[in-house]
């Protein structure tokens, strides 16, 4: 079977209530660096929220073997990020602190994961983050077209 590199990602960024942006980024290194930059900015924004739990999941819908899940605990400052990485049923769980080293580690995991996604033939990506109880909550949404 022929391997297909992801052509582009459509990003929906909901930074505040009633503020939405839609940007297309290509599946090159600049595109992924841009996505990671948005994630970093979003994480900093989450630090200002005092009450909600956040889950960020990044997975290929047609292949559930590769999934990254980040759980942000409900504290004013982010205490830890729980990371579960399931790659072909090899599940690893990490607790990492919300400091610059953690973001570098998170970035490396995402970059590795993106490389895995390139192996999918017809992968649909859904990058979804936000607060479950409030539809107007901040969030970053990525859909592969």
Give residue ranges: language-model regions.
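Positively charged, low-complexity terminal tracts
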Residues: 1-145
